[in-house]
A protein has these predicted regions:
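Conduit-forming functional cores of very large proteins
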Residues: 66-68, 129, 145, 174, ...
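Short, structured patches in soluble enzyme cores that scaffold and shape functional sites
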Residues: 37, 65-69, 127-129, 140, ...
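Gly/Pro-rich turn-and-neighbor structural signature
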Residues: 9, 123-141, 149, 154-156
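Acidic low-complexity segments
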Residues: 1-55, 87-130, 245-247
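Short beta-strand elements
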Residues: 52-84, 205-208
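Short helix/loop capping segments that flank catalytic or ligand/cofactor-binding pockets
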Residues: 54, 73-77, 134-137, 144-148, ...
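Dual-mode signal for accessory low-complexity, basic/Gly-rich regions
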Residues: 18, 155-250
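Extended active-site and interfacial segments that coordinate phosphate-rich ligands
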Residues: 60, 77-92, 142-151, 220-233
């Protein structure tokens, strides 16, 4: 990460300005503006002489406005709930138009609470980015976690319908479905230069033309070295990542 951190006063002034701008109508009953900044330093030292230090600065701005009318309450957010979480500095907020968004989100909240309910029935649906992200997260992200595939998460967060023999031929979706995991993109939340085993980051195809090819994450534990090692060799997997050193690899 590069650049200097803005002083707290600048953050407070920005948040107060957006909060004030959201109060446009008596039907606006709740609003919030926030910026969470996380700093982390990871250092990996190996017995083979490796020494890698990586520094991260993660920005999580949030803006939400709730409107109430005729017994109904609806909430509108900027880019979805937790929809903005990237590495970087104040440029992340500028990229998503945070400054000046308070009034717009409030207007959208009013439009939402006054809009008629969606009609019932079977029809085509166009997914907005925040819903598309959730769909990918649940339908592809979690099922391709190796700890779930191996059954280690069954008592915590569940298992997966994916089994090791599916890789290389299982049709996950239509030929239009292409999904990659690319930790080399500098701005993304899950980006890194080297993973927690010292493997250099690289772009990996998860699903290509609808066919399942690879896990989105890599996983290694000494307690499971034999069975995980066999699967990793089968899939051509190297490396491992985890959310923090309070957790096992995921």
């Amino acid at each position: 990460v590069d650049g200097q951190e803005p002083p707290p006063r600048d953050w407070y002034e920005l948040l107060m300005a957006e909060s004030t701008a959201a109060a446009i109508d008596p039907r606006i009953v709740d609003w919030s503006a926030s910026v969470e900044v996380r700093h982390a330093t990871h250092r990996l030292v190996t017995s083979e002489g490796g020494d890698v230090e990586q520094r991260y600065r993660i920005m999580l701005p949030g803006l939400a406005v709730s409107a109430h009318a005729d017994g109904d309450t609806q909430t509108r957010t900027l880019n979805g709930y937790r929809g903005i979480c990237q590495q970087g500095g104040p440029e992340v907020l500028a990229r998503f138009g945070f400054a000046g968004a308070g009034r717009r989100v409030a207007e959208e909240a009013l439009e939402l609470v006054l809009a008629p309910n969606c009609p019932a029935g079977r029809m085509d649906v166009l997914l907005a980015p925040d819903q598309m992200v959730l769909q990918i997260h649940e339908s592809i992200g979690h099922p391709l976690e190796l700890d779930r595939i191996l059954g280690d998460e069954r008592n915590f967060a569940g298992t997966s319908f994916v089994t090791p023999d599916m890789f290389g031929h299982y049709r996950y979706g239509s030929e239009l479905l292409n999904v990659t995991f690319d930790p080399t993109r500098p701005e993304e939340l899950a980006s890194y230069g080297y993973d927690d085993e010292g493997t250099r980051a690289e772009r990996t195809w998860l699903i290509r033309r609808g066919i399942l090819e690879h896990l989105w994450e890599d996983f290694f534990r000494l307690t499971d070295a034999n069975r995980v090692g066999v699967l990793c060799n089968f899939l051509g997997i190297e490396g491992g990542v985890r959310p923090s050193h309070e957790h096992r690899y995921t």
